[in-house]
Amino acid sequence: MWELEWTPQAEIQYYDILSYWVEHNGSNSYSMKIMKEVEKSEDLLMYNPFIGQEHYLSSPYTKIRRLLVLKHFSIIYRITDKVEILSFWDNRYDPKKLASLIL
């Protein structure tokens, strides 16, 4: 089993998205759904970190991977001696912004 670590930036993105959906919907039901799916994704990554698709931002030196969560979100991560989550990304955002955040 691999160790999993969220970067501070990824944690902020994750909690910002959860907060947005609580405010937007006036309830926490969709945020709870996101949280459950993220927990499932974390379990998958700890046991099989290569399950995510190689991301287009990868290079020969930095292999960046992406795991889809609920169609609209992605966990962006890299594998070193652990699984390091670099970003929790809303796929509707501008992809150019993602590159500036993780590279």
Predicted regions and their residues:
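Basic, Lys/Arg-enriched alpha-helical interface segments
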Residues: 1-63, 103
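Enriched for short, Lys/Arg-rich terminal
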Residues: 69-103
